[in-house]
């Protein structure tokens, strides 16, 4: 989008200059509210169209997908195009990455994990733990990188201690800080 601004030079001459204008999220929302009977539907459809342009095959509202996409963008990784396999790869496609996220004050959860499917950890080179702001759950405040071998060792310890009915293991922020390195802040 372009607009015109008036500028005054040193001789008090007024000139108009064409400039590129980028609106922020609040301005975009105000515009959409003015021009749509159903702003929510338009916003979701727009994000879905953007997702499709990027080549993603999975449903926009698949749990975890938007944060995985966001983390991959922040770290310069290639986000998976389907829900199968690792969450992302490096630019060359030679390393697989898994992303875990939580809000500040929570713990990073690895769901549906047990002795029989440790390949979900082993297929990865690294894990990235993304911490989101407690008040604004869309704002990623910090990301740590942890080698998959370290995550696997901890997962085996946790699995050995957990009840048969539980298939979720958690990693505390303290564990991540101790075992990882900050790659985004």
Where are these regions (language model features)?
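Nucleic-acid endonuclease domains
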Residues: 2-185
């Amino acid at each position: 989008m372009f607009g015109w601004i008036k500028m005054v030079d040193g001789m008090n001459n007024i000139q108009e200059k064409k400039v590129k204008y980028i609106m922020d999220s609040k301005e975009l929302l105000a515009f959409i509210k003015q021009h749509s009977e159903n702003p929510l539907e338009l916003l979701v459809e727009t994000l879905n169209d953007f997702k499709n342009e990027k080549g993603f095959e999975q449903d926009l509202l698949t749990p975890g997908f938007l944060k995985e996409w966001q983390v991959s963008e922040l770290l310069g990784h290639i986000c998976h195009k389907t829900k199968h396999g690792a969450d992302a790869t490096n630019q060359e496609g030679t390393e697989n990455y898994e992303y875990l996220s939580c809000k500040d004050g929570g713990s990073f959860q690895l769901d549906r994990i047990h002795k029989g499917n440790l390949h979900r950890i082993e297929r990865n080179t690294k894990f990235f733990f993304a911490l989101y702001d407690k008040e604004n759950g869309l704002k990623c405040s910090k990301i740590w990188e942890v080698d998959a071998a370290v995550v696997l060792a901890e997962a085996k310890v946790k699995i050995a201690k957990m009840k048969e009915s539980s298939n979720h293991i958690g990693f505390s922020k303290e564990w991540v800080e101790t075992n990882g390195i900050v790659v985004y802040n």
